[in-house]
Amino acid sequence: MLSEILLIPAATGALAFAGLKLRKQKQYRQLEARQHDLAVRYGVALNLPDRLPTELPDFRQRIVVIPDPLPVAAFEILREAALRRGNTERSYFPAHKQGGTVAYEYLHDIAPEIVAFYQSDYLRRLCSAVIGEPVVPTPIHDQSSCSLLFYERPQDHINWHYDYNFYHGRHFTVLVPLVNCHLQEDRLSSARLVIRQDSREITIPTPPNTLIVFEGARVFHKVTRLEENELRVMLSMTFCTRPQTSLLKGTIRRFKDIAYFGVRALWT
């Protein structure tokens, strides 16, 4: 009798989870259907170059920095799109991270220009040329595929970590600093991207309109703490050589995403 009583809430919970999962899958199909239209409509305004830079840095250290990868007008469009966002999803894990995030699915409505840039042929070709093999954007249900990272309160940071690879192929993080400044002084913020390489700590320059490409599963990295009257807004994107995944990796990804996007990540 007791076991039958306990089965009722368990079954109810399972049905509720399945319903949320199906609803989320439908939403992702609708967003995917919109992506082509967004890329065409906002891609015209971005007016990205047809040709790639003639000289590209070497990727042997699994991280490169490309200054001024975007025309000024295109960069300003992305920056303004990021700054008109609504509230960020704040996360705080003692001794590891603190900050705000805007997830991929929300960018389709509040910053479609950013989605168009992420899906652009120019960015895909540029990243492929830098890395040395073809890459593609990661799937829409991965909330970290394309997101905005807001360091907007004192002490916002993320401690030393690797970026876990949830896919069968190689996985890369691509960053574009959209805002990085002290709000009252003419200088960059105190939040700095630092990597550990050959037992040395190296600060990676992140002024606005810089493209940073790195293989996060191989590059140990952190972002130092923001101070008062500072703002740092990063466009964070991910690409991979093979976007397929396994059930186990997909489950791990969803639990990881809880740290950034809350419990709703469980049914992405």
Task: Report the location of each language-model feature.
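Fe(II)/2-oxoglutarate
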Residues: 1-59, 258-268
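Short N-terminal helix-initiation segments at or just after the protein's N-terminus
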Residues: 5-8, 110-123, 138-139, 175-186, ...
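Non-heme Fe(II)/2-oxoglutarate
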Residues: 43-131, 225-268
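Short, well-ordered beta-to-alpha junction loops that form the rim of enzyme active sites
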Residues: 68-69, 217, 237
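Catalytic core of non-heme Fe(II) oxygenases with the double-stranded beta-helix
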Residues: 128-218, 230-233, 241-249
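Short glycine-rich, flexible loops that bind phosphorylated cofactors or substrates
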Residues: 221-222
